């Protein structure tokens, strides 16, 4: 417990907030190149094969990014746009690939939540 004199001399130091997406350098999105595309199993109560990509961003950071939706066309050397946003049951995956931009195609025939998956508007009859 500091004395009043110590507080007058030094004051209180503000706690710094930690940046969860430091690799993005305060940018909303960053472009990167896929180094490897693979699957990973989630944490305990869940069971699946989640698709992830190891991406080297334009600022030379290597990250793991989740590929959302069913099916994808990503390969090694594909160029993707990455946004922040973690995957709760995959430790160490703190980014999402954006569908429908650069080399990662949107999901065809998707009707709901189209904007999140880069899907075209369905033709009305």
Curated annotation (Swiss-Prot):
Q: Which GO terms describe its cellular component?
A: mitochondrion; ribosome; small ribosomal subunit
Which residue stretches belong to region Disordered? Answer: 1-27
Q: Which GO terms describe its molecular function?
A: structural constituent of ribosome
Which keywords appear in this protein's UniProt record, sorted alphabetically?
Mitochondrion, Ribonucleoprotein, Ribosomal protein
Ranges of biased composition (kind: Basic and acidic residues)? 10-23
Q: Enumerate the InterPro entries for this protein.
A: NA-bd_OB-fold, Ribosomal_uS12, Ribosomal_uS12_bac
Q: Which biological process annotations from GO are given for this protein?
A: translation
List localization entries: Mitochondrion
The superkingdom listed in its UniProt entry is Eukaryota
Q: Which CDD domains match?
A: Ribosomal_S12 (cd03368)
Q: Name one Pfam family in it.
A: Ribosom_S12_S23
Q: What PROSITE patterns has UniProt attached to this entry?
A: RIBOSOMAL_S12
Protein purpose: Protein S12 is involved in the translation initiation step.
Family, similarity comment: Belongs to the universal ribosomal protein uS12 family.
- Mind telling me what this protein is named? Small ribosomal subunit protein uS12m
The species this protein belongs to is: Zea mays (Maize)
């Amino acid at each position: 417990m500091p004395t009043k004199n110590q507080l007058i001399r030094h004051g209180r130091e503000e706690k710094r907030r930690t940046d969860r997406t430091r690799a993005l350098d305060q940018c909303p999105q960053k472009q990167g190149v896929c180094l490897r595309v693979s699957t990973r199993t989630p944490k305990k109560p869940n069971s699946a094969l989640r698709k992830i990509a190891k991406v080297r961003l334009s600022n030379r950071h290597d990250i793991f990014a989740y590929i959302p939706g069913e099916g994808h066309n990503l390969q090694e050397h594909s160029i993707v746009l990455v946004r922040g946003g973690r995957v709760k049951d995959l430790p160490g995956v703190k980014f999402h690939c954006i569908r429908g931009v650069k080399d990662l195609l949107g999901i065809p025939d998707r009707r709901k939540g189209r904007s999140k998956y880069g899907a075209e508007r369905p033709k009305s009859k």
